[in-house]
Amino acid sequence: MKISKKLQSPVEDGFVGVAVTTTARLHMGFFDLNGNLGRRFGSIGVSLDQPATELSAWQAKGFSAEGNGAERAIKVAKKLAKAVNLQGGMAMQLTQTIPAHAGLGSGTQMALAVGLAMDKLYDLKLNINDVAMLTGRGERSGIGLGAFAVGGVIIDGGRGKQTLIPPVIARADFPEAWRIILVFDHANSGMHGDQEVE
């Protein structure tokens, strides 16, 4: 994840914006679905260089977005703004997005990108876990959050009885010489939304 500030607003004169870039992740599975080890789920995954979501955002009076994934970005921004009682809005530009419903964590990465952009624009003092909880992300796996925060190969410790977000317990660099090839089936969409929870 990269965050940069100091973008001139194309929407409102004088507003400074932020740019957030975050990449996809592969979730390689859970290792304790029923909690026999004292924590449920626990998983391993890896962050990828591409595909990525690139979001630029500026303070605005309302909520707007342009680009692929605009509706999703607006929905997340409104949900988060309501949760923190934000009085302002956000104008967003998406120059690229992770393919939705392809098993690459596009929803989590979008939520974190929008949330961290809002945090930087309005100095909300939110961290990644705050954004995840307020947007309903990271409830079963911490891989998407770990990919956003630190990248590499990630293992999360699963959810304990008092754990809201599964913590990253191990992380390593992914060898640069190794390659991952993604093959997409554009005729079918992966499980998402309520289907994943069942």
Placement of each model-derived feature along the sequence:
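ATP-binding N-lobe of GHMP and related small-molecule kinases
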Residues: M1-A102, S106, D119-I128, F184-S189
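Glycine/serine-rich anion-binding loops at beta->alpha junctions
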Residues: Q96-K120, E139-F148
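ATP-dependent small-molecule kinase catalytic core of the GHMP/sugar-kinase superfamily
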Residues: M1-T21, G29, G35-R39, N127-E198
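Generic structural marker for isolated residues within well-ordered, non-membrane alpha-helices
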Residues: A77, G115, A132
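N-terminal low-complexity, intrinsically disordered patches enriched in charged
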Residues: G38, E54, L112, L116, ...
